[in-house]
Amino acid sequence: MKTTLAIVVLLAVGALAGDVAGKWSGTFRVSGGDHSIPQIIVLKQDGNRLTGSAGPDAGEQYPIENGKIEGDRVTFELTSGEWRFSYDLKRAGADEIKGNLELKSVNNRRTAVVSLSRMK
């Protein structure tokens, strides 16, 4: 009985840790910057594969590329103009994701800190 209960609890915790589908909002702050940039991210999950879109608001969204989830780690990329955005995030609770963002263009590279909350 104890073994069965332990397995059920582990499966439930594993399923919860992997559930990132939905709308997320928050900001990213570029290193050395003095303000935060808003973000709205819509994640669609199929197993460990992520698709969806991200951008500064609901009207300006860019498709997510190379999205995946491994445990509580969430990674994806997107392109906006000459900029390539590479997100490396981690679940910080059921309704919170935090991590880092690398922004690259031909002549520039920046890093940012990302903080997102699930929209209800």
Where are these regions (language model features)?
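Central antiparallel beta-sheet cores of small beta-barrel/beta-sandwich binding domains
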Residues: G18-K120
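Sec-dependent N-terminal signal peptides
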Residues: T4-G14
